[in-house]
């Protein structure tokens, strides 16, 4: 999946004496900037790096876009994180993970089936 958007997006790396977090964003049209991937190096998770990177995106793009959007699985780990970052649920794409991956995807013991989109005004 990553190869579908990596070359059309912009990658950002948060470097704090070494890489801590990265993300890729794409212009989805109609004023929507989408976070396609955000990941924090495991030893540095839950230390505010991903939230700081999201805030950097908000500041950088608030005059160019009207909405920052992210799609994720309905996981007890990711949904609350994005909600704490100011995102609200927008819509879902049924069966996204089962239709686009040749193997089951699990996060925190939850089998991911639908893609949940969350949005934050910029």
Regions from the language model: what does each represent?
Residues 69-71, 83, 88-111:
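Conserved catalytic-core motifs of GNAT/GCN5-like acyltransferases
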Residues 60-74:
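Conserved GNAT acetyl-CoA-binding A-motif
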Residues 31, 66, 88:
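Short acidic/polar active-site loop segments enriched in Thr and Asp
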Residues 1-42, 54:
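Acetyl-CoA-dependent GNAT
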């Amino acid at each position: 999946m990553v190869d579908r958007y990596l070359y059309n997006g912009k990658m950002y790396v948060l470097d704090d004496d070494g890489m801590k977090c990265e993300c890729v964003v794409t212009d989805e049209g109609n004023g929507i900037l989408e976070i396609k991937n955000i990941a924090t190096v495991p030893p540095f998770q839950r230390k505010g790096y991903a939230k700081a990177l999201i805030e950097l995106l908000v500041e950088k793009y608030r005059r160019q876009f009207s909405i920052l959007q992210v799609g994720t699985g309905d996981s007890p780990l990711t949904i609350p994180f994005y909600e704490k970052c100011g995102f609200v649920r927008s819509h879902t794409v049924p069966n996204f993970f089962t239709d686009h991956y040749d193997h089951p995807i699990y996060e925190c013991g939850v089998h991911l089936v639908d893609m949940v989109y969350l949005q934050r005004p910029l």
